[in-house]
Amino acid sequence: MAAWSPAAAVPLLRGTRRLPLLHWAQRMFASQTEAELKVTQILKEKFPRATAIKVTDISGGCGAMYEIKIESEEFKEKRTVQQHQMVNQALKEEIKGMHGLRIFTSVPKH
């Protein structure tokens, strides 16, 4: 039987994106990153009637790709493409430094 070594355990401690599983566990229970908080704050200012805003760094921690979910009355009677354009316009300066952005918009159901 081979001796155990830390190097042998590395494959067991990796997540699906080749990042340590410990990183994913810490991220799952952590609050928002500074960049996520910044984007969230901008969206709160641009969409004051929003009932829900969630910004998630989906790049693995480098801040290059985000998923944004926002629910707001401001989107009422607008097509999805128009809603997404509103979000893009609100974040136009931040988008310059991003690799990608996933946007999910909705209108609150009463």
Swiss-Prot record:
GO terms for cellular component: mitochondrial matrix; mitochondrion. It is found in: Mitochondrion. The keyword Ribosomal protein does not apply. Keywords: Mitochondrion. Gene3D superfamilies: BolA-like. It comes from the Eukaryota. Acts as a mitochondrial iron-sulfur (Fe-S) cluster assembly factor that facilitates (Fe-S) cluster insertion into a subset of mitochondrial proteins. Probably acts together with NFU1. Interacts with NFU1. This is BolA-like protein 3. It comes from Bos taurus (Bovine).
